[in-house]
Curated annotation (Swiss-Prot):
One of its GO terms (biological process) is regulation of DNA-templated transcription. Signal peptide: none annotated. It comes from Arabidopsis thaliana (Mouse-ear cress). GO terms for cellular component: nucleus. PROSITE patterns: BHLH. One of its GO terms (molecular function) is protein dimerization activity. This is Transcription factor bHLH87. Flowers. SMART domains: HLH. InterPro entries: bHLH_dom, HLH_DNA-bd_sf, IND-like. Residues 127-227 are annotated as: Disordered.
């Protein structure tokens, strides 16, 4: 009884499966611009129906006859006793047909997934070049069913194999200006290689860029030295102007009052520092203190010395000393001339008449004389 119920359940499942498949076959399947019509599917299902093993169906029918007699003897249900062997044969063929169609659908789905994988790999390659160039690609995948091949097994049964081929069209690229790098996409020839396309770098086309001519290089490297000669001519006036400015500063500084008194500088207080009493270290410290005091005095004498470091201040002090020596020599040369002028003034007459008409005071004519009382 349990075996009969299981067979009946499988038969009902096959009928529902066949009805769904027939409804699904009414719609067209479109992929890559090609249509798979329901006629081909119906022909394949009828072909599968013819390929059922007759020995297996006869054995199954004998078993069903025995089960029918047992069911009639036990009087269990009028529903199971009324099953016709021909209808069971149809149901069995439907189940086998549904199994074959399910395997065919699985093969079709695997083919579609492989095509999707190729398109995905191609999209990944093309997206890498879409930053600097506009790539227009036209790819169409055609699915052409080849004639069915029958492979006879050892048990007398036949199996069916279907093969599909995909033919991508050639890639077209709209190029503007040559940039020196060229890539090409090639479909792999070997079936063992998975994926979509290969990326090949073309070195011959990268060399097609025109090299720069020697004239252009020579023209770009020309340098005119006219401006540099003008700058070299202007160096001397700048040096003279600087010398004149320094001379003016030195003359202004020479008339300033000079204070040679040593300024008392507070020594910085150091914490946690032990001062050594060694005579050599004490002598070296005193020598450094004297040098620093003299440098401070020299900075006050040299114009602008307080705003300079020690090295530049010493250079400025040497220049200022040269200027002072030149001024001393110039004054020494002027001394005899001053002595001669003093002698000429001393030999001239210095006595003048006291009552000279020119020295008489002028009287006011409008002066009123009052009479004396």
């Amino acid at each position: 009884m349990e075996g009969l119920e299981s067979v009946y359940a499988q038969a009902m499942y096959g009928m529902t499966r066949e009805s769904k498949i027939m409804e699904h076959q009414g719609s067209d399947l479109i992929w890559g611009g090609n249509e798979l019509m329901a006629r081909e599917l119906c022909s394949s299902s009828s072909y599968h129906h013819q390929l059922i093993n007759p020995n297996l169906s006869s054995c199954f029918m004998s078993d069903l006859g025995v089960l029918g007699e047992i069911q009639q003897q036990q009087h269990v249900g009028n529903r199971a006793s009324s099953i016709d062997p021909s209808s069971l044969d149809c149901l069995l063929s439907a189940t086998s047909n549904s199994n074959n169609t399910s395997t065919e659908d699985d093969e079709g789905i695997s083919v579609l997934f492989s095509d999707c994988q190729t398109l995905w790999s191609f999209g990944g390659v093309s997206s890498a070049e879409s930053e600097n160039r506009e790539i227009t690609t036209e790819t169409t995948t055609t699915i052409k069913p080849k004639p069915l091949k029958r492979n006879r097994g050892g048990d007398g049964g036949t199996t069916e194999t279907t093969t599909t081929t995909t033919k991508p069209k050639s890639l077209k690229r709209n190029r503007g200006d040559e940039t020196g790098s060229h890539f090409s996409l090639v479909h792999p020839q070997d079936d063992s290689e998975k994926g979509g396309f290969k990326l090949i770098y073309d070195e011959n086309q990268s060399k097609s860029k025109k090299p720069r001519t020697e004239k252009e290089r020579g023209g770009s490297s020309n340098i005119s030295f006219q401006h540099s000669t003008c700058l070299s001519d202007n160096v001397e006036p700048d040096a003279e102007a600087i010398a004149q400015m320094k001379e003016m500063i030195y003359r202004a500084a020479a008339f300033r009052p000079v204070n040679f008194g040593l300024e008392i500088v507070e020594k910085p207080k150091r914490k946690n520092v032990k001062i050594s009493t060694d005579p050599q270290t004490v002598a070296a410290r005193q020598r450094r203190e004297r040098i620093s005091e003299k440098i401070r005095v020299l900075q006050t004498l040299v114009p602008g010395g307080t705003k300079m470091d020690t090295a530049s201040m010493l250079d400025e002090a040497a220049n200022y000393l040269k200027f002072l020596r030149a001024q001393v020599k110039a004054l020494e040369n002027l001394r005899p001339k001053l002595d001669q002028t003093n002698l000429s003034f001393s030999s001239a007459p210095t006595s003048f008449p006291l009552f000279h008409p020119s020295f008489l005071p002028l009287q006011n004519p409008n002066q009123i004389h009052h009479p004396e009382c």
